UniProtKB/Swiss-Prot annotation:
This is Exonuclease. The keyword Magnesium applies. CDD domains: PDDEXK_lambda_exonuclease-like (cd22343). Its cofactor is Mg(2+). Mg(2+) binds at D119, E129. PANTHER family: EXONUCLEASE, PHAGE-TYPE/RECB, C-TERMINAL DOMAIN-CONTAINING PROTEIN, EXONUCLEASE, PHAGE-TYPE_RECB, C-TERMINAL DOMAIN-CONTAINING PROTEIN-RELATED. Its EC number is 3.1.11.3. The keyword Nuclease applies. One of its GO terms (molecular function) is metal ion binding. Trimer of three subunits that form a toroid, with a tapered channel passing through the middle.
Length: 226
């Protein structure tokens, strides 16, 4: 997936985009992204009816295609994370010994239906997801709990990022600037084929349902960028 194709389809030069800016939000419109994929793979408690969180995300993506507008998110926790992300990345590079290249958005293929926004692509071939927890309690939970303490939504995010990029491993790091020392902790998450099989099955079904719903109201995917 080349920058030229993205430019041709969206009018946006991805090489000039930074995570979090207006162009970045526009590139994600109607696209199933890593941070939200836990909604797509959410399973019903019984029967086949989609859970509320899956249905809600479905309607959100449809609205983004039809309006070309993303819902506003102004959470304090997001602002906190953004504020310390560069410090976290620098400390991670120093601690791990790998070089990190920023990458605003990566699409799985030319359909542009699925994408992830890594916090970095590492010189050893792995990806990087950085979290700067809003509370030190959450940092402590991960610091002591490791893999077991990673939220299911975050695990889905990392596994989906590997599905999109076809990488085999991903660093998952937490940074807390309030810690007097030992403020960075990370683990390496390996590609899990169970997740891959789940994405292979559920994501195309979800996209098909999106296209059916869009057709019903007279829209097609891609109109969000016109």
């Amino acid at each position: 997936m080349t920058p030229d194709i993205i430019l041709q389809r969206t009018g946006i030069d991805v090489r000039a985009v930074e995570q979090g800016d207006d162009a970045w939000h526009k590139l994600r419109l109607g696209v199933i992204t890593a941070s939200e994929v836990h909604n797509v793979i959410a399973k019903p408690r019984s029967g086949k009816k989609w859970p509320d969180m899956k249905m809600s995300y479905f309607h959100t993506l449809l609205a983004e295609v039809c309006t070309g507008v993303a819902p506003e998110v102004n959470a304090k926790a997001l602002a906190w994370g953004k504020q310390y992300e560069n410090d976290a990345r620098t400390l991670f590079e120093f601690t791990s010994g790998v070089n990190v290249t920023e990458s605003p958005i990566i699409y799985r293929d030319e359909s542009m239906r699925t994408a992830c926004s890594p916090d970095g692509l590492c010189s050893d071939g792995n990806g990087l997801e950085l979290k700067c927890p809003f509370t030190s309690r959450d940092f402590m939970k991960f610091r002591l709990g490791g893999f077991e303490a990673i939220k299911s939504a975050y695990m889905a995010q990392v596994q989906y990022s590997m599905w999109v990029t076809r990488k085999n491993a991903w660093y998952f790091a937490n940074y807390d600037p309030r810690m007097k020392r030992e403020g960075l902790h990370y683990v390496v998450i390996e590609r899990d084929e169970k997740y891959m099989a789940s994405f292979d099955e559920i994501v195309p079904e979800f996209i098909e349902k999106m296209d059916e719903a869009l057709a019903e109201i007279g829209f097609v995917f891609g109109e969000q960028w016109r």
